Amino acid sequence: MKTNLLRRLLALLLAMVSLFALPVLAEEGEDWEDEDISLEDVETEGDAEDEEIIVSDSEDASIEGLTPLYTTKIKAFVKTGKGINMRLRQDLESDVVTFVKTGEVITIYKVYPSFVLCEYNGYVGYIVRTWIDENMTVLDPENTPPYGVVPSQYVATLTQTSDVHVSPSLDSDVMKIHPAAGCKIAILEFVDGFAKVLYWRSYGYIDASLLTDLVVVSPTLDPEDHDMPIAAFCSFFEYNTGKEGNEGRCKNIAHSADRMSKIMYPGEQMDLNNDVGPWKKANGYYPAPVLINGGSQLGYGGGTCQSSSTLYNTVRQIPGITIVYRKPHGPGCAKYLPMHQDAAVGSSTLNFIFRNDCEFPIRIQAESTGEGTLCIQIFRVYEE
């Protein structure tokens, strides 16, 4: 009896150890624990470490002519944090408009990649998205997309390796990622001869003369042309860095794009861990940085969180698709997308599951050459 009991306890202990050793398919730096420091310290130091905030719109805050979109609360991620500063411009060094305490409600008028333009007790200014609760109230659901949804107007292909500028000017600074020829991008709009894109936690601008095969994204779920996508989104990633695991990460993004490309019929569900994973060598995945027990090491499937997160941002643009299960990469979310817009995969608790509740089939077309971008389009399928 005692021997059997000991064996059972040992088996249970081994099972628990293996459970906690499951890899999280996020690259190093995407997840962290809360620190016992003041919120003001985090605002001036922590954000700069986690995200490169590059803002071309540096005008003073104003809500003149704008319609309120959402209400939400200030959410502190640190034990000693009491609130956050509202800033005059999208700049952590700009003047402080007022101080907003944790738990207070703000009204959001415009959402930017790193900030929200908001009003609080008659004060108007910018607050970093890190410090707001993503579970917010949509004030006009019929005319306002859910918070964080970023619809694209066009999709195009690069004809050559391209710079991504911080503003619509060839004289402006460039980002560190230079997507290669053949990469597809999802375009928000055209500004002064440049394609405006969402680049990590900022906007980027690509010379429009370097684009070909321009496709319009349908503004409705019933496109005029059956070849028009009804949703599109892209994300950017580093390649050819020479860092350990980077090549494997790029291959994993491209491979997972192929595996998630399919037709989904009404009522059909996609479970990323099961349907695009399992994240194993046998399924064609390569070693790349993953998080295991709070540390980073090489593991099969590393980088596919960027694939799941890009897909998450694409399907959210379609009202008939239901998000069944989604978790972010901890409080800070993933750095390659705006705050609150990621979907982690790779463990029993980190997964992305969604269901097609549209009245029609959809076709997911995910494409990546492994050289800088992952672009996902969704098409409505018209059955004969």
Each PLM stretch: what is its role?
Residues 30-85, 99-102, 110-112, 134-163, ...:
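SH3-family beta-barrel domains
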Residues 20-33:
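Sec-dependent signal peptide cleavage junction
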Residues 2-10:
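Bacterial N-terminal signal peptides that target proteins for export
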Residues 129-137, 208-217:
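Structured surface patches comprising rigid loops and adjacent beta-strands/short helices at the edges
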Residues 14-19:
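Hydrophobic core
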Residues 85-89, 165-168:
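Short, cationic motifs built from Arg/Lys/His that form the positively charged side of catalytic pockets
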Residues 98-130, 179, 183-209:
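SH3/SH3-like beta-barrel superfamily modules
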Residues 143-159, 166-184, 188-192, 200-201, ...:
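Well-ordered beta-sheet/strand-loop patches within structured domains
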